[in-house]
Amino acid sequence: MSPTHLPSAEYYASLPKHIAGAGAVIHDAAGRILLVQPSYRTDTWEIPGGGLDTGEHPLQAVRREVKEELGIDLTPGRLLAVDWVAEQADGRPPLVNYLFDGGLITQAEARTRIHLDPEELTAWQLATPEQWDSLLAPHMARRVHACSRAMTQGLTVYLQHGFDLTGRQT
């Protein structure tokens, strides 16, 4: 029996679907990371970023999202982590999130350069590693801790829902 080959359009339509996002890990010299509070979710904080638009690649998305959310023109640094999040019980498709080094910012620079989009964000802060677990959702806290290690150690890590599966944890 010979294998059946689908026409390209049918084959591509049959492949699994996922969504993608990109985030910026913006930090200061003391290791604090810039966190933002979404206007639509006041119980937790996040890092700047968001979903990729159709036809957009992750670097374009992180630049656009940081510009929209913070008013900052960002030139992202290296890729720190890729985080795969499986399909959720609420029906959200699988997510692949690309996390980039967003560079250094001082408290003084942040005060003058950050202009929040009030429709998206209500506040920002430079948070210490000790604050991350209480401010961030558990998967986001794991993600930020992993990105901090990746920056310090010069690594890129692979995560699954924030868990580092590269075996390089310290």
Where are these regions (language model features)?
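A generic fold-level signal
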Residues: 17-19, 28, 92, 119
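Short, solvent-exposed loop/turn segments at secondary-structure junctions
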Residues: 16, 43-44, 83-88
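Unchanged
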Residues: 52-75, 84-140
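Residue-level preference for beta-strand/loop junctions
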Residues: 18, 43, 94-96
